[in-house]
Amino acid sequence: MAKTLTASQAAKEHVLAVSRDFISQPRLIYKTVSGVNGPLVILDDVKFPKFSEIVQLRLADGTLRSGQVLEVSGTKAVVQVFEGTSGIDAKNTLCEFTGDILRTPVSEDMLGRVFNGSGKPIDKGPPILAEDFLDIQGQPINPWSRIYPEEMIQTGISAIDVMNSIARGQKIPIFSAAGLPHNEIAAQICRQAGLVKIPGKSVLDDHEDNFAIVFAAMGVNMETARFFKQDFEENGSMENVCLFLNLANDPTIERIITPRLALTAAEFLAYQCEKHVLVILTDMSSYAEALREVSAAREEVPGRRGFPGYMYTDLATIYERAGRVEGRNGSITQIPILTMPNDDITHPIPDLTGYITEGQIYVDRQLHNRQIYPPVNVLPSLSRLMKSAIGEGMTRKDHSDVSNQLYACYAIGKDVQAMKAVVGEEALTPDDLLYLEFLTKFEKNFISQGNYENRTVFESLDIGWQLLRIFPKEMLKRIPASILAEFYPRDSRH
């Protein structure tokens, strides 16, 4: 039978336990900084330093900074300082080893708040009253207890909903480049995302209380941060949004922990508060460059284009923190945004990201130059989980066939357009001219839509059918006869 203690006995026991632990693991303060290299501080004569241990640094002027032990070699310790190393004086800096890993306070009160890249509130609000302190590396999810994502999220964007459907619990990045409207697309998805409302079928968890957005910005400019903040405030969803902002003028090293803090908050909201969380991470290219900077400071052997050899593993520790877990109603859907340097999809950052994530949404500069919004090029875009999230009972039974046929016609239209540039329009067959007409109308009527235009998946499918009616039935070889008989003769509603 458990022994019951009075309050005073319990307090005494607690003091004994703390002092016992303190004696075996004393929190020593060192003044042995032997060097500073980029974002790293090297300490000598350290007793029992531990890997990933958090170190508190007190500068000569009394400023407090925190860092993490990256490397341990005998009595030497290499500490990465999250707030940067500017102003650190080797003689007068005090370093205290805390004996604990990096944890972040989490609470449902984080919604509606704005934090910096280190997780400290910057919205002039009170500190977070923590319900728990969680390790920012997250809990490993047993693959056996993961649930396959099967509920489609309707984004209201035709090029995504019909051609590259996103399932709840999926991780799908936006591959973009400098100067393209990836922020506007992400904001539109945040505004419009919800479950597909099927007539006659009640969707219980579609109401707003159950939906949250966690937004993490790494190395973005003030304009981008202001754009998202203003957008969330204007559409009234700010009380369901948690923002982590590491701006371009903030320390580079801080970018390493910003996405992990955001995902820890998202995991708490999804698995403890059972909310459906949409995580937007921008810009992953800045994150990878911060990783390269730390790797160079540690003098590690560089990999492709100077990025560290472990970048694939490191990116996976972020992207894999999405999904659904058995026994929990919440989910985490991840939409990382990355800007491809020089529009190069073979660059290591998009290349490795594409291997880990379940598809990608490709934002195209040529479409953007033709004033098409959203400039989503459907041919290199892909959603690997689309097949399980669409069809009868989820969207409509013609969904996958319409999608396949639109893909086929658009691809042939692109080939015809290239051929026309060589041989001229007079040399094209009547069929070729139909494909050219389809190509123009597909980009103008289907891909292109308004910034605030929220099309249901059924409206998008109807627009798809409207375009397919350009062709005679015999040319629509990707659609079964039964589907054609039911949907092809329909009068257009638009």
UniProtKB/Swiss-Prot annotation:
Example of a GO MF term? proton-transporting ATPase activity, rotational mechanism
Q: Which InterPro entries match?
A: ATP-synt_VA_C, ATPase_a/bsu_AS, ATPase_F1/V1/A1_a/bsu_N, ATPase_F1/V1/A1_a/bsu_nucl-bd, ATPase_V1-cplx_bsu, P-loop_NTPase, V-ATPase_su_B/beta
Residues annotated to bind ATP: 384
GO CC, alphabetical: proton-transporting V-type ATPase, V1 domain
Q: Which domain of life is it from?
A: Eukaryota
Query: What CDD domains has UniProt attached to this entry?
Result: ATP-synt_V_A-type_beta_C, ATP-synt_V_A-type_beta_N, V_A-ATPase_B
Q: PROSITE patterns, alphabetically?
A: ATPASE_ALPHA_BETA
Keyword set, alphabetical order:
ATP-binding, Hydrogen ion transport, Ion transport, Nucleotide-binding, Transport
GO terms for biological process, alphabetical: ATP metabolic process; vacuolar acidification
Q: Which Pfam families match?
A: ATP-synt_ab (PF00006), ATP-synt_ab_N (PF02874), ATP-synt_VA_C (PF22919)
Query: Which PANTHER family does the UniProt entry name for this protein?
Result: V-TYPE PROTON ATPASE SUBUNIT B (PTHR43389:SF4)
UniProt function note:
Non-catalytic subunit of the V1 complex of vacuolar(H+)-ATPase (V-ATPase), a multisubunit enzyme composed of a peripheral complex (V1) that hydrolyzes ATP and a membrane integral complex (V0) that translocates protons. V-ATPase is responsible for acidifying and maintaining the pH of intracellular compartments and in some cell types, is targeted to the plasma membrane, where it is responsible for acidifying the extracellular environment. Essential for the proper assembly and activity of V-ATPase.
Concerning HAMAP family, the annotation shows: ATP_synth_B_arch (MF_00310)
Describe the family membership recorded for this protein in Swiss-Prot or TrEMBL: Belongs to the ATPase alpha/beta chains family.
Binding partners and assembly:
V-ATPase is a heteromultimeric enzyme made up of two complexes: the ATP-hydrolytic V1 complex and the proton translocation V0 complex. The V1 complex consists of three catalytic AB heterodimers that form a heterohexamer, three peripheral stalks each consisting of EG heterodimers, one central rotor including subunits D and F, and the regulatory subunits C and H. The proton translocation complex V0 consists of the proton transport subunit a, a ring of proteolipid subunits c9c'', rotary subunit d, subunits e and f, and the accessory subunits VhaAC45 and ATP6AP2.
The identity of this protein, by name, is V-type proton ATPase subunit B
